[in-house]
C-alpha cells in the first residue's frame, strides 16, 4: 500500500507554497502521496507560523492531539516545520518528545534524509539552519492542478521591523536566480497555469542574478514573465512600501497582465508609531506611492495590514491610522491587536493600554474596512468582470467559481457541461454582491 502524508499549514502564502514543496520532495524521494485525513497518514507535518502568539499555541494544541494518534500508530512520523520550528528548535522536542522531525523553512529539502536518519537511529532530528537559497536547488519540478500557482522568488527579510520575527525565523533577504524563476514559471505555464502569484516576505526587494552576471530587479522579472503567452495574470505578495520604486509603478503602466489589486501593508498611520515599528517611511510617503500608482491605474484595489495597540499607541495615534484608512479607501485589510513576539525589540516596550481599549479600537477599524469592502462590492454590481474560472463553486457543485482582478470570489451559473471552462478566462455580468463574494451570469458571445 502506498504511504501517505498529511500536511497542516498555518499562516501565510509562503507557507502554503512551502507545504506544496514538502509534498513534492517526499513524493519524489519516498513515493508519499497526500491525504486530507491525519489518521490515514504515515507522515504528518505541521508547517507553522509564529507571526502571532495565537497561531503558535495552535501548533502545540495540535501536537497534543497527535500524541494520541502516535500511541495507536507507533511508526507514525510527526514533523514540525516553518517559523515556530525555526524559533523554538530543540525546545519543541523537550515539550513534545514524540515529535520526530523539526525543520526550518530553509531546510525542507532535507526532509528525505531527516526521515531516513530518524528511522535508522531512532533519534529525533532537528535542522533549523539557514543555508540561504539552497533548498530551491533540490526541488523536483513543480506539479500543479488548476489554473493558479504560487512561485517563491526570494526568502527572508532584512527590514527588521521592531515587532516582527521573520528575519529571525526565515533569515535575511536572499533572491533566487532570475533564470530559475523564469524556468519554474514556464513549467507551470506548460501545465496550463494562467495566473502566477510571486511570493516573498518582501518581493519588491528582489535582486536576482541573471545569466550574464547582471542583477534583475522586481520590475524586470515581472516584464519577462508577462512575455509568456500562456500567463494571463500576475499577482504578488508581500510588498514593502520602502522598496516600492517608481520603476515598479511604471511597470503597472506597461504591463496589463499585472492585476488591478495591490496588497501594500501600511501597519499604521501615525508617524510616531511607524518610527517605533522601524518601518522606514512616513504616512505621507506611503500615500505618495499610492497617489502615483493611481495616476497610472485609477481603479486599482488596495489592501493592507494594520496593527492595533502597538506599545505606546495613544488615541491621537489611533486617529491618525483611521485618517489614513479614510484617505486611502482600502478595499479590504487584515487587522490584529499587537502580539509581542519573543526576541523582537517591540516585545520589551512598555505597554500600558488596557486590552479593552485595544479591542474597541480594533472593532472600530474593522467596521470601517468592512463598510468599504461592502461598498466596493456593491459598486461592482452591473459591471462585466473578467474572471479566471478556478473550479466548481464550494457551495453549489452545479455552479462555477472564479476571481476578479481585485481578488473577489465570483460564483456563477454557466449551464450544463460547463466543466470545460475551468482554467479559462470568461466574462461574467455581476448581478449580486454579498459580504465577501459576488454572484453573476456568464456573458455568452453573440
Curated annotation (Swiss-Prot):
[4Fe-4S] cluster 1 binds at residues 12, 49, 83. SMART domains: Elp3 (SM00729). [4Fe-4S] cluster 2 binds at residues 157, 161, 164. Its cofactor is [4Fe-4S] cluster. Its EC number is 2.8.4.3. GO terms for cellular component: cytosol. Its main location: cytoplasm. It catalyses: N(6)-dimethylallyladenosine(37) in tRNA + (sulfur carrier)-SH + AH2 + 2 S-adenosyl-L-methionine = 2-methylsulfanyl-N(6)-dimethylallyladenosine(37) in tRNA + (sulfur carrier)-H + 5'-deoxyadenosine + L-methionine + A + S-adenosyl-L-homocysteine + 2 H(+). It is found in: Cytoplasm. It is an enzyme of class 2 (transferase). Keywords: 4Fe-4S, Cytoplasm, Iron, Iron-sulfur, Metal-binding, S-adenosyl-L-methionine, Transferase, tRNA processing. Residues 378-444 form the TRAM domain. Residues 143-375 form the Radical SAM core domain. It holds the Pfam family UPF0004. Residues 3-120 form the MTTase N-terminal domain. Binds 2 [4Fe-4S] clusters. One cluster is coordinated with 3 cysteines and an exchangeable S-adenosyl-L-methionine. GO terms for molecular function: 4 iron, 4 sulfur cluster binding; metal ion binding; N6-isopentenyladenosine methylthiotransferase activity. NCBIfam families: miaB-methiolase, MiaB/RimO family radical SAM methylthiotransferase. Monomer. Belongs to the methylthiotransferase family. MiaB subfamily. Catalyzes the methylthiolation of N6-(dimethylallyl)adenosine (i(6)A), leading to the formation of 2-methylthio-N6-(dimethylallyl)adenosine (ms(2)i(6)A) at position 37 in tRNAs that read codons beginning with uridine. This is tRNA-2-methylthio-N(6)-dimethylallyladenosine synthase. The lineage of its organism: Bacteria, Pseudomonadati, Pseudomonadota, Betaproteobacteria, Burkholderiales. The gene is miaB.
Amino acid at each position: 500500500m502506498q504511504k501517505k502524508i498529511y500536511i497542516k499549514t498555518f499562516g501565510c502564502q509562503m507557507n502554503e507554497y512551502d507545504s506544496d514543496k514538502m509534498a513534492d520532495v517526499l513524493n519524489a524521494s519516498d513515493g508519499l502521496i497526500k491525504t486530507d485525513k491525519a489518521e490515514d497518514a504515515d507522515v504528518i507535518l505541521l508547517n507553522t507560523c509564529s507571526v502571532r502568539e495565537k497561531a503558535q499555541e495552535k501548533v502545540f494544541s495540535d501536537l497534543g492531539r497527535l500524541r494520541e494518534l502516535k500511541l495507536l500508530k507507533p511508526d507514525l512520523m510527526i514533523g514540525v516545520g516553518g517559523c515556530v520550528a525555526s524559533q523554538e528548535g530543540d525546545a519543541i522536542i523537550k515539550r513534545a518528545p514524540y515529535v520526530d522531525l523539526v525543520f526550518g523553512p530553509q531546510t525542507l529539502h532535507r526532509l528525505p534524509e531527516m526521515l531516513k536518519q530518524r528511522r535508522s537511529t531512532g533519534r529525533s532530528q532537528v535542522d533549523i539552519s539557514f543555508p540561504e537559497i539552497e533548498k530551491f536547488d533540490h526541488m523536483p519540478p513543480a506539479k500543479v492542478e488548476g489554473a493558479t500557482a504560487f512561485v517563491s522568488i526570494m526568502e527572508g527579510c532584512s527590514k527588521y521591523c521592531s515587532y516582527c520575527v521573520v528575519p529571525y525565523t526565515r533569515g535575511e533577504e536572499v533572491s533566487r536566480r532570475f533564470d530559475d524563476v523564469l524556468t519554474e514559471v514556464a513549467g507551470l505555464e506548460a501545465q496550463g497555469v494562467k495566473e502566477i502569484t510571486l511570493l516573498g516576505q518582501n518581493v519588491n526587494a528582489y535582486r536576482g542574478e541573471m545569466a550574464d552576471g547582471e542583477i534583475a530587479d522586481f520590475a524586470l522579472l515581472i516584464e519577462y514573465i508577462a512575455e509568456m503567452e500562456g500567463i494571463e495574470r500576475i499577482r504578488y505578495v508581500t510588498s514593502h512600501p520602502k522598496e516600492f520604486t517608481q520603476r515598479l509603478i511604471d511597470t503597472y503602466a506597461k504591463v496589463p497582465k499585472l492585476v488591478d489589486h495591490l496588497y501594500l501593508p501600511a501597519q499604521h498611520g501615525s508617524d510616531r508609531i511607524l518610527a517605533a515599528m522601524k518601518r522606514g517611511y512616513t504616512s505621507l510617503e506611503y500615500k505618495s506611492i499610492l497617489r502615483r500608482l493611481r495616476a497610472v491605474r485609477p481603479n486599482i484595489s488596495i489592501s493592507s495590514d494594520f496593527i492595533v495597540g502597538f506599545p505606546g499607541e495613544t488615541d491621537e495615534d489611533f486617529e491618525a491610522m483611521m485618517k489614513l484608512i479614510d484617505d486611502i479607501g482600502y478595499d479590504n485589510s487584515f487587522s490584529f491587536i499587537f502580539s509581542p513576539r519573543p526576541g523582537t525589540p517591540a516585545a520589551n516596550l512598555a505597554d500600558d493600554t488596557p486590552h479593552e481599549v485595544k479591542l474597541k479600537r480594533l472593532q472600530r477599524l474593522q467596521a470601517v474596512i468592512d463598510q468599504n469592502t461592502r461598498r466596493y462590492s456593491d459598486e461592482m454590481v452591473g459591471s462585466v468582470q473578467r474572471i479566471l474560472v478556478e473550479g466548481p463553486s464550494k457551495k453549489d457543485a452545479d455552479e462555477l467559481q472564479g476571481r476578479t482582478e481585485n481578488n473577489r470570489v465570483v460564483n456563477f451559473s454557466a449551464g450544463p457541461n460547463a466543466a470545460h471552462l475551468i482554467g479559462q478566462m470568461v466574462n461574467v455580468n455581476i448581478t449580486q454582491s454579498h459580504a465577501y463574494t459576488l454572484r453573476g451570469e456568464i456573458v455568452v458571445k453573440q
